[in-house]
């Protein structure tokens, strides 16, 4: 991501986001993880809307965040492609078996950026809950030796009622069980984070009552 372009976006978009992306930020443990990201990290979240990236860009204002973006969004039109390139987005084709995007994500982390991944892989339909997580974010965080920051957004953009919940940062290696195979560990850790994000959603919904 071009840091000058990132800051240009944040400065020019700061006032508009106060209205459309207005939100309340909730912390699981503010001492462990707050809105300031002190080291490169993998941010994961449920997926509600194309504006999810925007809300995290302004929530973690100090960080340079590069999102993982599906081909249907990245290639939507020339303007979108231009923005995605300058925001440092990594394109992934969900219908192919090309995993080179993971190397690109690791490179982003190695150069001091944070990355944003939506492990559901797509935006759920209205009648669907949180979709099963895909494990690519675990491989990336493990290889780059960076923490994962689980988050949740209610996605009620434009209403002023959005809630963003920030969980504690977690290192993948801290969740490994030496008695299990690599595949078993990855599956268990993926389910762990899926359930963690669900709990963040419960916190967000409880806060709305």
Residue ranges, per PLM feature:
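Helix-enriched interaction subdomains in cytosolic or periplasmic regions
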Residues: 1-16
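Non-catalytic C-terminal accessory region of glycerolipid acyltransferases
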Residues: 4, 101-209
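Short, glycine/polar-rich helix-capping loops at beta-to-alpha or helix-loop-helix junctions
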Residues: 9, 75-79, 159
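Helix-to-loop junction immediately C-terminal to a conserved catalytic motif
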Residues: 13-47
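A generic structural signal for alpha->beta connector loops
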Residues: 22, 62-64, 86, 112, ...
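A generic local structural motif
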Residues: 23-31, 53-54, 102-104, 135
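Catalytic core of membrane glycerolipid acyltransferases/transacylases, capturing the structured
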Residues: 35-96
């Amino acid at each position: 991501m071009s840091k000058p372009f990132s800051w240009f976006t944040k400065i020019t978009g700061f006032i508009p986001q106060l209205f459309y992306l207005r939100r309340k930020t909730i912390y699981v443990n503010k001492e462990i993880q707050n809105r300031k990201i002190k080291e490169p990290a993998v941010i994961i979240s449920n997926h509600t809307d194309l504006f999810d990236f925007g809300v995290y860009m302004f929530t973690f204002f100090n960080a340079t965040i590069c999102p993982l973006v599906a081909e249907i969004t990245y290639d939507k039109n020339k303007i979108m492609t231009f923005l995605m390139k300058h925001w440092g987005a990594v394109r992934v084709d969900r219908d192919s078996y090309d995993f080179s995007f993971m190397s690109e994500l690791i490179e982003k982390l190695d150069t001091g950026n944070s990355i944003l991944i939506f492990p559901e892989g797509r935006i759920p339909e209205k009648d669907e809950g949180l979709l099963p997580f895909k494990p690519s974010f675990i491989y990336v965080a493990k290889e780059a030796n960076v923490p994962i920051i689980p988050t949740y957004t209610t996605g009620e953009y434009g209403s002023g009622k959005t809630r963003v919940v920030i969980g504690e940062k977690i290192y993948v290696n801290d969740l490994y069980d030496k008695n299990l195979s690599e595949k078993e560990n990855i599956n268990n850790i993926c389910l762990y984070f899926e359930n963690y994000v669900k709990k963040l959603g419960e916190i967000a919904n409880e806060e709305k009552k």
